[in-house]
Amino acid sequence: MIDRYKHQQLRIGSVSPQQISAWATKILPNGEIVGEVTKPYTFHYKTNKPEKDGLFCERIFGPIKSGICACGNYRVIGDEKEDPKFCEQCGVEFVDSRIRRYQMGYIKLACPVTHVWYLKRLPSYIANLLDKPLKELEGLVYCDIESYPNFSFARPITKKPTFLRLRGLFEYEIQSWKYSIPLFFTTKGFDTFRNREIYTGAGAIREQLADLDLRIIIENSLVEWEELGEEGHTGNEWEDRKVGRRKDFLVRRVELAKHFIQSNIDPQWMVWCLLPVLPPELRPIIRIDGGKLMSSDISELYRKVIYRNNTLTDLLRTSKSTPGELVMCQEKLVQEAVDTLLDNGIRGQPMRDGHNKVYKSFSDVIEGKEGRFRETLLGKRVDYSGRSVIVVGPSLSLHRCGLPREIAIELFQTFVIRGLIRQHLASNIGVAKSKIREKEPIVWEILQEVMQGHPVLLNRAPTLHRLGIQAFQPVLVEGRAICLHPLVCKGFHADFDGDQMDFKVPLSLEAQVEARLLMFSHMNLLSPAIGDPISVPTQDMLIGLYVLTSGNHRGICVNRYNPCNRRNYQNQKRSDNSYYKYTKEPFFSNSYDAIGAYRQKRINLDSPLWLRWRLDQRVIASRETPIEVHYESLGTFYEIYGHYLIVRSLKKKILFIYIRTTVGHIALYREIEEAIQGFSRAYSYAT
């Protein structure tokens, strides 16, 4: 449905009989009103065509083939010159056959029927609103005279003396009435009394719901709740629990009444007079081998409802000669048939077919993982999507993700085909697919061009908040797993222990704009709930930062005078003997040389080294004394401290300063420095 703000939405709830009639009823061009399903038949056994006024009637639900009526005549759809727009012989409109996916019908019930979801599901909405025990209402609905009366007195509709007015004159209720009154159901003249003052079955429930004033219910419930609260504890545990349960019931009753008022729902709509019939394409008949037809369970349950409803209609037409108990039994059968259609097995033993197989009711069709909502509407499989395991991609940018080549070529295959044809590298789709199967080099070049203009959406179930689905710029990677930056894992509540994520390609221009402007991962650095940073180092990143900056903290003395420390120094085994050659800690004039030496595997990540420091950034402590002093032949000397080294001239002027560090510290420092400089430039541009 579409609201007044033109927002498409889906709302599930009770509807009025007028709304059901408006959905299912249509007026043909000749003025005939159709929509009511009166026959339990499906297809004729000789012609294999839908029966008129049956569950697959073409007059009610539309033609099976677009533009072809039941007689076989053909008209062009949408052509205004074609006249008439429906067949005068069979009454079928010349419209698109897709109308059979959404055109509904209805069954006019011979007696009111309660909706089993509102009666039997816990908590029972009908029992809560009427403030009556559920068993009493079930005895009324299902005509169980042994436990509860199967009738209810109606309010007086005239000012004349009635049995109900006479009953109200008595001070006490005569309990024997509810057993003696049904004995008069077969007497002459009782039909007038029954129709005027007595309701049975679901009709009694509907009248009681129609008499309710929801606002008065709210006021009375609040007053009673306050009175129970003022009484306090009685000291009797049983009584206190009883009072607590009553207070909880009053709260639920108030909330339910408020919901009905806010959603503008009349409580009597929980009792049906018109039963909606689903479109035939949602309960199809399939032709199997041998020419046999296999019907869906929903259609079979509809047939049972129509059979029993037609039987009740015939009994009511001959009500003068039909015993009242027989009518009530048939009303019970209609109620049970509708209950089975909506929720098979809710009242106990489910109904089965001839092969002892349980019928699949409407509740079974829509609920669960394989139901209509979760499988077909909400979580259905769509094109341009896939799923794979996620692994860490440490070399990726925050807004990028790595797609395996095998997945990417299938995901963007249509775009690659279009690119091959546009660049005249393939004459048709078949040739383009052949090039893709052979994995020619030009295919990967076009694929990379296509991926640059198409972001992908990554989602990890369950999507509990907005950051559960984010946009990324895809890049090609080897393997079969999706590579993801570890900083974005917290938003997805994901880790790299086998988690899977699905990805989709936004196709429309609006979706791509939304992905780039609102959903990119580098645009969602803060939690939308509390504003705290969401992209923070966790797990693998924390371990990596620790390893990167761990180094060797045992001090210069231990490292320098421990020749057995083979990891932190390059100890090379000589060919002439078995001892290890000791190599001094290397000196580097800048950080680029140090990182270059690490990439050439001349030093390790945590190997101590001396890095030249700027003279304007002093690291000398005021009272610190050097550990060693080395003198050169030209007069210069080195003052070696715990974590730095000073080179002085003959006149004790500081020439150079070296700090003792590792490649890991240098790499982290450079990343922080670049980030600060980038932030400073962005801030200067903004101001």
Curated annotation (Swiss-Prot):
Residue positions binding Zn(2+): C69, C71, C87, C90
Entry EC no(s): 2.7.7.6
Binding-site list for Mg(2+): D495, D497, D499
Primary subcellular site in the record, as a coarse category: plastid
Compartment(s): Plastid, Chloroplast
One BP term from GO: DNA-templated transcription
Catalytic activity: RNA(n) + a ribonucleoside 5'-triphosphate = RNA(n+1) + diphosphate
Keyword Zinc belongs to the record: yes
Source taxon at top rank: Eukaryota
Keywords: Chloroplast, DNA-directed RNA polymerase, Magnesium, Metal-binding, Nucleotidyltransferase, Plastid, Transcription, Transferase, Zinc
GO cellular component assignments: chloroplast; DNA-directed RNA polymerase complex; mitochondrion
Cofactor(s) this protein requires: Mg(2+); Zn(2+)
Annotated cofactor note: Binds 1 Mg(2+) ion per subunit.
Single GO molecular function: zinc ion binding
UniProt keyword Iron-sulfur present: no
Its biological purpose: DNA-dependent RNA polymerase catalyzes the transcription of DNA into RNA using the four ribonucleoside triphosphates as substrates.
Family, as annotated: Belongs to the RNA polymerase beta' chain family. RpoC1 subfamily.
Quaternary structure, from the entry: In plastids the minimal PEP RNA polymerase catalytic core is composed of four subunits: alpha, beta, beta', and beta''. When a (nuclear-encoded) sigma factor is associated with the core the holoenzyme is formed, which can initiate transcription.
Name of this chain's protein: DNA-directed RNA polymerase subunit beta'
Organism this protein belongs to: Solanum tuberosum (Potato)
Lineage summary: Eukaryota, Viridiplantae, Streptophyta, Embryophyta, Tracheophyta
Gene field: rpoC1
